[in-house]
Amino acid sequence: KIQITGLLGDVMKESVQIAVTLVKSRYPEKADLFEKNDLHVHVPAGAVPKDGPSAGITLTTAIASLVTGKAVSPEYAMTGEVSLRGRVMPIGGLPEKLMAAQRAGISRVLIPAENVDDLDEVADEVKEKLKIIPVKTVEEVLKKVLK
């Protein structure tokens, strides 16, 4: 059973479902974990409504970390919608997300490759402080961030 809490909208709930499906398909030898155990996904600040597909890659990475026992490298932040085939798809609000990452002290941010043109809208002082890494697939992301 999958439980989802944190005042999430329908699109974000779908992102959790897609993340679970992707992880099951990428780690078939671990699929029985989902049959034998419940999964509870909570996105903090429970009273604040959250929605949209941008956390898809982050949710997928978190669930892959749980299943594999590999930690996520703390130097990374990431944003991107994911498809059921594992493609990292573009998101909106990239300048604001990169500014927030920089303010939080993050050094590396994974973004959808299809959002590279949006970097023109990002302030130079933000870009100078971040290593911005375009990615196309879930596999690329997991190879970079799971240790």
Residue ranges: model-predicted function:
Residues 1-147:
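Peripheral, non-AAA+ core regions of ATP-driven protein-machinery
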